[in-house]
Amino acid sequence: MKNIVLILLLITSLISFHGCNNPKDENTIEFWTLQLSPVFDDYFHSLIKEYEAHNPDIKIRWIDIPYDAAIQKLLASLAAGNPPDVVNLSADFLAKFAALNALEVLTTHIPADSLRQIYLSNALEACTFRNQTVALPWYLNTYALIYNKKLITQAGFSPSDIPSTFSELTEFLREYKNRTGNYALFWNIGKDSYLPMMLGSEGIKMVNSDITRALFNSPEAVSLINSWMDLYKQGFLPSESLINTGASIIEPYQSGRVAMVFTGPVFLKRIKDNAPGIYSSTDIAPPVVGVTGKHELAAMSVALTKKSRNKKQALDFALFLTNNQNQLNFCKLATIFPSTKEAMLDPYFTSGDSTLETKARLMGARLLPKATRLRYYLQHPKFDILRDIFDESIQSIGLGNVPVKKALDLAVREWNIILGDQ
């Protein structure tokens, strides 16, 4: 079976990289990003041109790949023995490839103290696998509660009624639907579920500290998940909440079907472009939190692959990409945040006008240094399998009427088999 999988990966690699992944020499640094083209083409072309001007013997080959294809394509390139030198990975992808020993340990090239002086501690922590730094932090984001002022006012609420905690949010969802007959929020609970993030913010762990045992069938976890499943079953959440993916979270808001969306402020631009009428009534509030007050950190990183033929130059380019000025320039193109301490102190993140974009930027910059990884299990190399098992258990509760405790017990049992096989 393993041989068949390897053959399929090799075939995939030939198909995926034919014509664009020619053998590299030591003077070519191949750099992959995740779904940043064509929107940011000008930025990357300019950045690469500047780097090559200062390093005339080096050529940067930039390849942008779809986010959903990232794991498959990187696995294929590794199987073919021709991976990129520098690769953009989300924090949860790091564990998978670090566990395969595919990523360079960066502290063998640059002192850990130097990295700690440059980057935010929470961002650097997101780039750590089994106590080893396997990537450099790049751009960051966190969550915000985006809401439609017009719909909120029409329902008889004021800005002071906007929920700030998950317990307030559940009450608000009920009251809004009772008053208007419409949904207040679309939030994924059954596919790309946000429930683990909610549990983490409420101080309820999904796994133990060394990620060897699942814990989300505790009485506290069962009670909280049951409260959200009651919201779904009683009609206070749209049916799509159980079956649609995270990619669909913005559409119900920008179409005016719901009054709120809990997501990254980076999506404000999409709302502005796709639904200017909705955007004109949009405001933003801090992320909803649980009893811990903690909120989620979303981190992008850049890693070096072990098979890079020029690790020194690859690291130099990765440091250039993530330096203060280049991160600041990138952040000015979207509502994202830098991972370097110095860039975060720039006036761009501390002052500005009264526009919504500025409000989101200043709020995010103020809150982001305290953001953390609430979904600790994402550090497991089989995070995607674990995620799917949990999602399926929630779907079985909503669609199959399986009791919450039974569904979570079954999911915990499956998780423990995987977590124990390390």
Model-identified regions with their sequence ranges:
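Long, aromatic- and glycine/proline-rich binding clefts that accommodate carbohydrate-like moieties
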Residues: 333-391, 396, 421
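Glycine-centered hinge/linker elements that transmit conformational signals in sensory
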Residues: 170-175, 211-242, 287
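Periplasmic solute-binding protein
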Residues: 94-102, 122-161, 188-210, 296-305, ...
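Short, polar/charged alpha-helical segment
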Residues: 37-59, 390, 408
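Hinge/lid segment of periplasmic solute-binding proteins
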Residues: 91-144, 170-173, 178, 197-202, ...
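Short, well-ordered beta-strand elements
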Residues: 25-38, 58-63, 85-86, 134
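Extracytoplasmic "Venus flytrap"/periplasmic binding protein-like
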Residues: 50-119, 126-128, 154-156, 252, ...
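Short, solvent-exposed loop/beta-turn-alpha elements that line the ligand-binding surface or hinge
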Residues: 107-119, 162, 204-225, 273-277, ...
